[in-house]
């Protein structure tokens, strides 16, 4: 017999009755009934009920066991009485009578219980992650992640992609986030960087003549934490192709992701048609570039109904350049209580409030109610109702000003309205491509022009477009949104040095700086670079959606906390003085 087990804790059935077996695992739960000790023994595969009566030669040792002791037992498989069969367990027809037991690893007092669904502070869960990972839900999440990655790899291979590994130590480059710098011992005063993405290397692969590339790539970014983003590192399905246009990339990645969501989506509907929505329309209709299309609400501009109206606040705002009034329709939201709650929500988000109109039954007709309705009058109110296609029991909310000042709040309000009114469809994965991103953006305070998205993207219109207004230039850049999350980001690359230098010049980077920062890629493009493009899909977010959790740390084995700390490994930590000396570094005191 094997030193530790003859079967897993999920393998024994009525067919094994009468056999002498060996199991190893953890004490999941222990119960004493009339002098008999019952133990649920757990391993990675499942649970088997074992019991020890006072006649057992190891009864005294079994009495000392506590939760999460790791043990090996030998025993005899016996059938449970019919009324004691547990149909919820694969092993529910049997139990094992202990004849021998060995403690493989004793357990101290537990900071968190593995058994049950009790909630614990996240700090506790992360500090004792090895205990947290023993819980069934966490094991399920991690196995799901492994299965998803394996499925992605197979689907990419089936599309004639091959996986290549790119360097983990490289040069720093401006790709939208802060770098993690690595000091060089052999070159004092100089630093490597952990790659924010394999961006330049995968493009260089295309220049090297490889037609298709993919990688399950680790990426490192020193970012502010969010529930859907790790503050230090993440994994992505990274891919690149030569001789492609934007639609070719869509046609490649769509069946891969659609297949993964159908395979692991637990029966949820997966949209078959993935619409293309311009960045401008996404901002207008949804207040975000990662809309949740399960929510049917579309915002609309209704400025004409307030211009010159009796509602002076909006009317005066509309006299200013670049302002508008935007409406958020709220089907079934027509109660003053709900409208007041949404107005309070806007105030909590930092806005003065949110105007509203709601429509109610009035005898044989319909009445528009709320302060706005009184101020703008029945004709304008009716025109708004018709434009928004609303009726009795419905409402509409209004925000005014420059879109940059209220758009994000409007998007969040749309989500809250959809959720609270039950409009957001459940058990569905709704995808949409967001396209036509602005190539550049201007700092609101300084007016400085910089890249808004990916600096290596091809501008729509090529070199000629860069001679005009930078803020009107669109890039061949695209994101894929699913249920309110950005899952994929990509672009058709700028493979022509002349256009690349011009694009960086618009963003304030001189030719010498471009050569210094991106010399490897710029030099490579002098030797016949093919048109190429690709994208990257976030593995962590894909699994997060499939696991039906809003916290990305639930699908990462050993995540950092929100302050970018690893409480289990005590990272970051202070270096030893001799390490700093060897690297030629000194830690300056912090104010």
From Swiss-Prot:
Pfam families: GAD (PF02938), tRNA-synt_2 (PF00152), tRNA_anti-codon (PF01336)
Enzyme Commission no: 6.1.1.23
Record bears the keyword Protein biosynthesis: yes
The keyword Lyase is annotated on this UniProt entry: no
Intracellular or extracellular location(s): Cytoplasm
Keywords: Aminoacyl-tRNA synthetase, ATP-binding, Cytoplasm, Ligase, Nucleotide-binding, Protein biosynthesis
Gene3D superfamilies noted in UniProt: Bira Bifunctional Protein, Domain 2, GAD-like domain, Nucleic acid-binding proteins
Region annotation (Aspartate) ranges: 199-202
GO cellular component: cytoplasm
Feature type site, description Important for tRNA non-discrimination: 33
GO MF annotation terms: aspartate-tRNA ligase activity; aspartate-tRNA(Asn) ligase activity; ATP binding; nucleic acid binding
Catalytic activities: tRNA(Asx) + L-aspartate + ATP = L-aspartyl-tRNA(Asx) + AMP + diphosphate
Residues binding ATP, per UniProt: 221-223, 486, 538-541
Listed PANTHER family: ASPARTATE--TRNA LIGASE, MITOCHONDRIAL, ASPARTYL/LYSYL-TRNA SYNTHETASE
NCBIfam families cross-referenced by the UniProt entry: aspS_bact (TIGR00459), PRK00476.1 (NF001750)
Family per similarity comment: Belongs to the class-II aminoacyl-tRNA synthetase family. Type 1 subfamily.
Stated name of the protein: Aspartate--tRNA(Asp/Asn) ligase
């Amino acid at each position: 017999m094997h030193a530790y087990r003859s079967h897993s804790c999920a393998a024994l059935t009525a067919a094994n009755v009468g056999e002498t077996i060996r199991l190893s695992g953890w004490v999941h739960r222990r119960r004493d009934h009339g002098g008999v000790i019952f133990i649920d023994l757990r391993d990675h595969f499942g649970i088997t009920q074992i019991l020890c009566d006072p006649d057992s030669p190891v009864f005294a040792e079994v009495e000392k066991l506590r939760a999460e002791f790791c043990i090996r037992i030998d025993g005899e498989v016996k059938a449970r009485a019919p009324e004691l069969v547990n149909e919820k367990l694969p092993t529910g027809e049997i139990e094992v009578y202990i004849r021998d037991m060995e403690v493989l690893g004793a357990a101290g007092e537990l900071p968190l219980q593995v058994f049950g669904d009790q909630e614990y502070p996240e700090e506790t869960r992360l500090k004792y992650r090895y205990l947290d990972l023993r819980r069934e839900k966490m094991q399920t999440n991690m196995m799901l992640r492994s299965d998803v990655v394996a499925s992605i790899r197979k689907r990419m291979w089936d599309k004639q992609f091959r996986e290549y590994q790119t360097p983990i130590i490289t040069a720093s480059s401006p790709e939208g986030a802060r770098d993690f710098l690595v000091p060089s011992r052999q070159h004092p005063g100089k630093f490597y960087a952990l790659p924010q993405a394999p961006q330049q290397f995968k493009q260089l692969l295309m220049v090297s003549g490889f037609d298709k590339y993919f990688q399950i790539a680790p990426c490192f970014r020193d970012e502010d934490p969010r529930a859907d983003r790790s503050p230090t590192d993440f994994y992505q399905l990274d891919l690149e192709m030569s001789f492609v246009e934007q639609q070719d990339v869509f046609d490649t990645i769509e069946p891969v992701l659609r297949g993964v969501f159908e395979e692991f989506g637990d029966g949820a509907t997966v949209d078959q048609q993935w619409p293309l929505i311009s960045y401008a329309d996404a901002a207008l209709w949804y207040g975000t570039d990662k809309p949740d299309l399960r929510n049917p609400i579309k915002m609309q501009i209704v400025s004409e109904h307030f211009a010159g109206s009796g509602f002076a606040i909006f009317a005066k705002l509309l006299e200013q350049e670049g302002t508008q009034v935007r409406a958020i329709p709220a089907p079934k939201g027509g109660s003053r209580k709900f409208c007041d709650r949404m107005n309070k929500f806007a105030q909590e988000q930092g806005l003065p409030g949110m105007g509203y109109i709601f429509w109610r039954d009035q005898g044989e007709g319909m009445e528009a109610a709320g302060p706005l309705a009184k101020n703008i009058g029945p004709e304008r109110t009716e025109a708004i109702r018709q434009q928004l296609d609303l009726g009795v029991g419905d409402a509409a909310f209004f925000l005014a000003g420059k879109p940059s000042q209220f758009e994000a709040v409007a998007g969040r309000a749309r989500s809250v309205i959809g959720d609270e009114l039950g409009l957001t469809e459940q058990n569905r994965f709704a995808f949409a491509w967001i396209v036509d991103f602005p190539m550049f953006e201007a700092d609101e305070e300084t007016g400085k022009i910089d890249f808004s998205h990916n600096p290596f993207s091809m501008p729509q219109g090529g070199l000629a477009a860069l001679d005009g207004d930078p803020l009107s230039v669109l890039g061949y850049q695209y994101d894929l949104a699913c249920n309110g999350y950005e899952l994929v980001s990509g672009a058709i690359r700028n493979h022509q040095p002349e256009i690349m230098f011009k694009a960086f010049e618009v963003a304030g980077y001189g030719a010498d700086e471009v050569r210094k920062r991106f010399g490897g890629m710029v030099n490579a493009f002098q030797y016949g670079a093919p048109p190429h493009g690709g994208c990257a899909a976030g593995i962590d977010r894909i699994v997060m959606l499939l696991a039906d959790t809003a916290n990305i740390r639930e699908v990462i084995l050993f995540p950092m906390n929100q302050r970018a700390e690893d409480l289990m490994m005590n990272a970051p930590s202070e270096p030893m003085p001799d390490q700093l000396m060897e690297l030629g570094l000194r830690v300056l005191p912090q104010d």
